[in-house]
Amino acid sequence: MVKINGEPQDAAGQSIAVYLGAAGYDSRAVAVEYNEAILSKAQYAATQLADGDVVEIVCFMGGGC
């Protein structure tokens, strides 16, 4: 399981980009912290989620994510 925003999620094996799209996030309007490191948007497609990972997704509000 991957902990995303404090909640366990069955997302191992997906890239950050795939997870964001499936969860309905606009990748242009979020910041992602992955195992205590901020990812650049260029890293979203190449970063694969694995069991034990901790991810925080922060939305920039201005109309919602």
Segments from the language model and where they lie:
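Ubiquitin-like/PB1-type beta-grasp interaction modules and other compact soluble beta-rich domains
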Residues: 1-65
